[in-house]
């Protein structure tokens, strides 16, 4: 299996006097060594100030904008971009090819539940291997962050969610399905390990709906037992966000699912349009939780990603960078807009904007505070 010394889902820091992305090895858990050499994407180049006009032109080209790989805040950190194609058995490879053509550095969220939907029984290991290989093949030598089955709630499965739940959003969903049907997770992890062995993509695997350190530890042990070496968890609940430092003691990276994080933090069903103003990643409580996770990642020098809709917001992306986020996952069409937004600001502005929003009392205040700091000078 191809193994990576520098783990998943993240951009790599390039200081202002570096012309290429830093390639320092990161420590492995449990004494695991790196194995094969990491195959990086194109190195990020430092851009002069006159590059702003080019960034705007690139952004207008839509999905082709992603061809300019190393978008970065000026005199600051290199950012790598990940796309988020759905992992449908039939459409997965085609969507992955679209993302690759759009210039994505990899896949920041490979949704595997689409292999399981519209079925009366679980897919076999062989069926899953074929589906996963179709996506991995589109990103040779690049990172693909795979989320294990996230069914339940709005995506119930007849062979996993046996009982109707009065409140499925708080019920048996995500990793919790493994309690009821452990064979589902075991088979999926085996299939991912086989697919990763057969392809050259750098595979990272993460579990959704993790709330406790025990859950993170158990998942990491299961994934590593089949040979998957880069293991993470989703941060979608306030519990996981508050325990981010402890989570990062047992996993290699974390990825913030801002859609669910907002829903659970504000106690507002994200399916209800009338509560839309509460399900807003600009809500100060959500931003402070993101900041706490970013602080934990910085303290341990481990990757922190965002794969919710917040990552595709050009106004919010610099704030997320300032809060400590190291990778952003978005649809291919959003790549250019977000890249252009980051190219227009400095790392210092990102950090200042993050500090400003942490002091905000309302979502409107947070937007205004960030805009004031990030306004063109």
Feature locations, PLM:
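Conserved alpha/beta-domain cores
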Residues: 69-377
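Acidic, glycine-rich flexible loop/linker segments
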Residues: 1-104
């Amino acid at each position: 299996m191809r193994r990576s010394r520098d783990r998943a889902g993240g951009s790599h820091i390039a200081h202002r006097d570096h012309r290429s992305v830093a390639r320092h090895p990161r420590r492995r858990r449990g004494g695991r060594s790196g194995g094969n050499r990491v195959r990086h994407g194109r190195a990020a180049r430092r851009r002069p100030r006159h590059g702003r006009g080019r960034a705007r032109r690139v952004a207008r080209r839509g999905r082709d904008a992603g061809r300019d790989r190393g978008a970065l805040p000026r005199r600051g950190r290199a950012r790598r971009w990940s796309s988020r194609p759905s992992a449908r058995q039939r459409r997965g490879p085609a969507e992955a090819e679209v993302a690759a053509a759009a210039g994505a550095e990899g896949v920041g969220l490979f949704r595997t539940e689409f292999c399981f939907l519209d079925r009366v029984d679980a897919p076999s290991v062989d069926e899953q291997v074929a589906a996963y290989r179709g996506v991995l093949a589109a990103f040779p030598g690049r990172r693909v962050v795979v989320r294990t089955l996230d069914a339940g709630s709005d995506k119930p499965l007849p062979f996993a969610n046996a009982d109707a739940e009065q409140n499925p959003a708080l019920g048996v969903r995500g990793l919790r399905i493994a309690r009821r049907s452990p064979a589902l997770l075991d088979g999926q992890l085996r299939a991912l390990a086989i697919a990763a062995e057969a392809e050259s993509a750098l595979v990272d695997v993460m579990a959704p709906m993790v709330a406790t350190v025990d859950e993170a530890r158990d998942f990491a042990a299961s994934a590593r037992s089949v040979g998957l070496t880069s293991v993470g968890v989703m941060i979608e609940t306030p519990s996981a966000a508050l325990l981010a430092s402890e989570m990062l003691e047992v996993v290699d990276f974390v990825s913030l699912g801002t859609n669910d994080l907002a829903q659970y933090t504000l106690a507002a069903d994200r399916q209800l349009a009338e509560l839309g103003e509460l399900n807003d990643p600009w809500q100060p409580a959500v931003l402070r939780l993101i900041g706490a996770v970013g602080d934990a990642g910085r303290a341990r020098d481990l990757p922190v990603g965002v794969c919710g809709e917040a990552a595709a917001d050009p106004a919010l992306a610099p704030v997320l960078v300032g809060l400590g986020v190291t990778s952003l996952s978005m649809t291919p069409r959003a790549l250019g807009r977000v890249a252009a937004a980051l190219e227009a600001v400095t790392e210092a502005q990102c950090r200042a904007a993050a500090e400003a929003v942490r002091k905000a009392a309302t979502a409107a205040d947070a937007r205004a505070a960030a805009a004031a700091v990030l306004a063109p000078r």
